[in-house]
Amino acid sequence: MDLFFGLSLIFGYLAGSISSAIIVCKLFSLPDPRTLGSNNPGATNVHRIGGKLAGFLTLVGDFLKTALPMVLVYKLDYGREASLWVGVMTVIGHCFPIYFGFKGGKGVASMITVVALVISPFAILIIGSWLLTLYTFGRSSIASIVTSLIIPFFGYHFKPELFVPLCALSVVVLIRHWSNVVDLLKDE
């Protein structure tokens, strides 16, 4: 690993630590998303709190903060796997932001952005599986958990060499959904 790639990983984490949800809520004079609704600083909760536009802008912000570091590394000829690792770091930053006491969002939008940028056709399957699971069970948490679990396996089918970073990506999002897993098990 050279110095630039190491710095790119740090930059990815710091970019991911920027909370689009908190910024959008401040711009729209909305309550802090960490204190209302699901208490999660993510696009879904901002949509609940502030409506479609606020939720959409949060989603766009999450996409941009994830995509920009990844595209930069890729354009500098570090390759797909390096770009994926930078994407993993942006998701870690989103979920555990240094600027907000390591209490961030669940990372689903950022995770899907990473997958879409690295393996575009694969993203259609991932988004489709998320939507199908949401439609079937009616809970976004279940859709996010199922999607996180299948990402490494679908990814292995398309790009076996990316299996390890895709596993890392999934583990980060599953860690942030652990309380949802516990709640789902209690309901059964």
Model-identified regions with their sequence ranges:
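Loop-to-transmembrane alpha-helix initiation sites
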Residues: I124, S140-T147, F158-V172
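Short, non-helical or kinked segments that cap or interrupt transmembrane helices
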Residues: P31-G42, F100-I112, R139-V146
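Membrane-embedded alpha-helical segments of multi-pass transporters/permeases
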Residues: A21, M70-V71, Y135, P152-H157, ...
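Cytosolic, membrane-interface loops and tails of multi-pass inner-membrane proteins
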Residues: I22-G55, W178-E188
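Alpha-helical transmembrane segments and their helix-entry boundary regions
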Residues: A54-F56, S83, M111, A123, ...
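C-terminal ends of transmembrane helices
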Residues: A21-V24, G93-K103, W130-F137, H177-L184
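Interfacial segments of multi-pass membrane proteins
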Residues: H47-G50, V73-L76, G93, V108-F137, ...
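Alpha-helical transmembrane segments in multi-pass membrane proteins
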Residues: F4, S8, G12, S17, ...
